[in-house]
Amino acid sequence: MSKTSNKSSADSKNDAKAEDIVNGENQIATNESQSSDSAAVSERVVEPKTTVQKKFRIESDLLGELQIPSHAYYGVHTLRAVDNFQISRTTINHVPDFIRGMVQVKKAAALANRRLHTLPAQKAEAIVWACDQILIEERCMDQFPIDVFQGGAGTSLNMNTNEVVANLALEFLGHEKGEYHILHPMDDVNMSQSTNDSYPTGFRLGIYAGLQTLIAEIDELQVAFRHKGNEFVDIIKMGRTQLQDAVPMSLGEEFRAFAHNLAEEQTVLREAANRLLEVNLGATAIGTGVNTPAGYRHQVVAALSEVTGLELKSARDLIEATSDTGAYVHAHSAIKRAAMKLSKICNDLRLLSSGPRAGLNEINLPPRQAGSSIMPAKVNPVIPEVVNQVCFKVFGNDLTVTMAAEAGQLQLNVMEPVIGESLFQSLRILGNAAKTLREKCVVGITANADVCRAYVDNSIGIITYLNPFLGHDIGDQIGKEAAETGRPVRELILEKKLMDEKTLEAVLSKENLMHPMFRGRLYLEN
């Protein structure tokens, strides 16, 4: 880039401030990324023409010059964003699926531009190599130091991606970082693109990948519940509605219902993920495809399908697709729904394990830590509790996504970054919560079969099974007397000679209580 000789004092101050910010950000990134990425980088670096080590390089943009750390693969636009958006201190470095999605877009664009002869072969080869360094070798995953909250509809991340890919490509060509007259972040890496089509497409790919991870975690969790259902299949217990005794069931049925609940959510999440495979790549600024060569729209989507292995398709109306964020609302709604089901299951686990002496105590959750600083021997259901809290956070994120989607204006929704922050966070924490619940709770659950059976034997709810023999009114009277006197239903029925003992025992047998079809056969025989 060309240097400005008469830099103002204001620019000098900005340089100093940016330098401080970058030094701090890079120290954080270095500490977090550990040594594996650094080793991979050192092994694959192509020696540049100049080997003299400098602490900084100078890059300039519309606003002037900035000093960029010489080791950094990002450039001046990224540094501006780091300075401007010090909001959450959570950076794109922590969202690898998003980084990969953006880089996949850059690779597909290079392939399409080469096939249409708008990008020279050598540049295309260098860009593709650079993208593969990130996608396959996982290099430079720590070179995205911008905050997840950012203005500009994602321009900062798009610029960041362009710069990292460009500087890696320059390395491939044997040039120094920042020698953009050889290969330019915008003119070459961003060729035939706008932030307004590359960013949402990369976003969709990242969310799609995150959904696959969440679906896999939910699948493992539902399998764990199913195994417990099989383990508890012969344990009879009372079912409850409105926290009152209802009719008997098996503990296995209760746990299999948890599994079926989660399996249903997998289907919903897959459908939501598939909606993300319609992209607006080729739309550029507002959907008209300005500055793209003829045929680019279909070429680039085909190339992106090759790069990702996904069946992507171009949106029917690119202007509509560029401004619409409905697919994100739908995706997060599916995530919220899964969180709602998971939270309800955790509520049930906490209730069923309550006690142990003054609660239901039908199941035992694995003890994970001491529960009180003042009450000895107390153990709390900390795993279901933390999952509940994660689900509440997902519910809040869903409202954020809804409000941000509604806030779009005319041909673009500039609020996509906060939609992305909410979606990626929900995917990450809900997936972690599902894994935690499975590993630290569900697989270790045991049943208190005697407690479960005692509740059934002492229940008034079993009177429901006698309706075909006694009628509802007599059942009411027996149930009321049992509640008032504390006497068992069986005893009152026999005392009043309302049924013979053989029939009563058959109807109230464990077989019939767990499989009520038996009662139907008995009724027909009579």
Swiss-Prot record:
SUPFAM superfamilies tied to this protein: L-aspartase-like
SS loop: annotated span: 371-380
The keyword Lyase belongs to this UniProt entry's keyword annotation: yes
One of the GO BP terms on file: aspartate metabolic process
GO cellular component: a single term: cytosol
Record: active site: S372
Task performed by this protein: Catalyzes the reversible conversion of L-aspartate to fumarate and ammonia.
Subunit text: Homotetramer.
Protein name from the UniProt record: Aspartate ammonia-lyase
Native source species: Corynebacterium glutamicum (strain ATCC 13032 / DSM 20300 / JCM 1318 / BCRC 11384 / CCUG 27702 / LMG 3730 / NBRC 12168 / NCIMB 10025 / NRRL B-2784 / 534)
Gene: aspA
